[in-house]
Amino acid sequence: MGANSLPTDATLDLDEQISQLMQCKPLSEQQVRALCEKAKEILMDESNVQPVKSPVTICGDIHGQFHDLAELFRIGGKCPDTNYLFMGDYVDRGYYSVETVTLLVGLKVRYPQRITILRGNHESRQITQVYGFYDECLRKYGNANVWKIFTDLFDYFPLTALVESEIFCLHGGLSPSIETLDNIRNFDRVQEVPHEGPMCDLLWSDPDDRCGWGISPRGAGYTFGQDISEQFNHTNNLKLIARAHQLVMDGFNWAHEQKVVTIFSAPNYCYRCGNMASILEVDDCRNHTFIQFEPAPRRGEPDVTRRTPDYFL
């Protein structure tokens, strides 16, 4: 259903649910189940390399920081007025993973052509059991059903997107097993994120100052140098790789002589890092503009996390 279709009972219901979510109020388990069924039908038809048209606003990690996502929409424009591409990591660490991921999935169902939601390394059963989403679902719903519904849906999220055949967008980075975009188009993504291999690498790898491939300190994926980025961009006729996955203090960070950019959209990450967030606006002429933003004002939340994480995924 297009954004301009006549409203039906279903879209009126969905509009009410989106409006409820925008107030940071979760849906019922039954509503989540029905929403995710519809989302699955839409996502099943999307490619591992999902084509996206400009103008589009590209966003990085959100990590359950719902009020900052609301601020992002305030600054970047509401969906569907603005076309959005999110590069994963909607859940874990922040206090509102449930509301954050439900809102993004709700917008996807309501405006499927206006928002693209890619998979991040945190959109996984294993990671969410450790970093907060599982516990949050238990706390808010009294059981793990909503966690299971969402983690089953995560298997269908596209892995990468391609803006106007020029900007390759993904959560993590490149893989020694992948030379071309067709390599990515050809694998079966509907599974839990594997511990190794090309699908894992796309969600876990990081650019590095050192040339070539390196062992990642994260324990999954690889580091890749400028020589790798240049070769990949050349082979696939790309101008830029846009990715998320790493905290950058200014909200964005260029690497590899502007062949790669990191975008991070969770300001004051974990409510303690003091970083700016940013989003990247790509206009009709493919010009890039970064918009930086600070945390939204918050009420009734702790200023610090209860426990400092040992390291950041």
Swiss-Prot record:
Modified residues (Leucine methyl ester): L313
GO cellular component: cytoplasm; nucleolus; nucleus; protein phosphatase type 2A complex
PTM: Reversibly methyl esterified on Leu-313 by leucine carboxyl methyltransferase 1 (LCMT1) and pectin methylesterase 1 (PME1). Carboxyl methylation influences the affinity of the catalytic subunit for the different regulatory subunits, thereby modulating the PP2A holoenzyme's substrate specificity, enzyme activity and cellular localization.
Enzyme Commission code: 3.1.3.16
Tagged with keyword Nucleotidyltransferase: no
A molecular-function term among this protein's GO annotations: metal ion binding
Cofactor note text: Binds 2 manganese ions per subunit.
Catalytic activity: O-phospho-L-seryl-[protein] + H2O = L-seryl-[protein] + phosphate; O-phospho-L-threonyl-[protein] + H2O = L-threonyl-[protein] + phosphate
UniProt xrefs under InterPro entries: Calcineurin-like_PHP_ApaH (IPR004843), Metallo-depent_PP-like (IPR029052), PPA2-like (IPR047129), Ser/Thr-sp_prot-phosphatase (IPR006186)
Transmembrane helix as UniProt keyword: no
Keywords from the named record: Cytoplasm, Hydrolase, Manganese, Metal-binding, Methylation, Phosphoprotein, Plant defense, Protein phosphatase
Listed Gene3D superfamilies: 3.60.21.10
Catalytic residues in the record: H122 (proton donor)
Binding site for Mn(2+) 1: D61, H63, D89
CDD domains: MPP_PP2A_PP4_PP6 (cd07415)
One Pfam family from the record: Metallophos
One GO term (biological process): protein dephosphorylation
Subunit structure: PP2A consists of a common heterodimeric core enzyme, composed of a 36 kDa catalytic subunit (subunit C) and a 65 kDa constant regulatory subunit (subunit A), that associates with a variety of regulatory subunits such as subunits B (the R2/B/PR55/B55, R3/B''/PR72/PR130/PR59 and R5/B'/B56 families). Interacts with SIC/RON3.
Identification of the protein by name: Serine/threonine-protein phosphatase PP2A-4 catalytic subunit
Organism: Arabidopsis thaliana
